[in-house]
Amino acid sequence: YYVRAFSKYGVVGDRSDENGGKIYVNPQSWAILADIVPAERLASVLGAIDGMETKEGIPLCSPPYAAYDERVGRMSGMLPGVYENGGIYNHAGCFKIMADCKLHRAEQAVGTFLKILPDGESNPSRLTTTEPYVFTNCYLKHPSVDMQVGFSWQTGTSAWGLKCYYEGILGLRRTYEGLKIEPVLPDSWKSVSAERVYRGNRLVIRYRNEQSG
């Protein structure tokens, strides 16, 4: 898989990091989105991504840093499982969903999306203590604050969550030539509908999944 970064200290985010942070999800997702993953390497990258995901979602890095690492800086100084240091990072999860959609991995895309949606099965509001209608940046996984939220009202997860649903899963993408419709629907979705205002026109789009059982 792809490493996180290079610094004056060497490589950051690869198998050699004994303190934590052996793998980061963003380099894998964005390598796919940027079309730079060779065909022979794709299975390894996808395996790395899928191996990071938990029942609550996907962390930014895995495993968390156990102690401060001057090569990494701020995030390694956080408690393991808090925010960027191994917390369930929904903003990064959105990038992963878009990568799944690009590869037509419908089950994986929707599976992660359902974990990101507020007040879901894995993140009920009674546990997270946040409003049931608000996207959150991350869920904390340190035992002392398990599944508490971080930055629920100031996060790119909101915009990216909508992008994942409309442009990724439903496949409604704006182009210069017009509106392109290329959905990535799981087999369990028999039908779905959406509304979109595009170039001054209100469109109602209904999907029927002929692959559905």
Q: Which sequence ranges carry the predicted segments?
A:
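Extended glycan-interaction surfaces of carbohydrate-active proteins
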Residues: Y1-N90, E121-V145
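Non-catalytic C-terminal accessory modules of carbohydrate-active enzymes
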Residues: G51-K55, A66, M78-E84, F95-G213
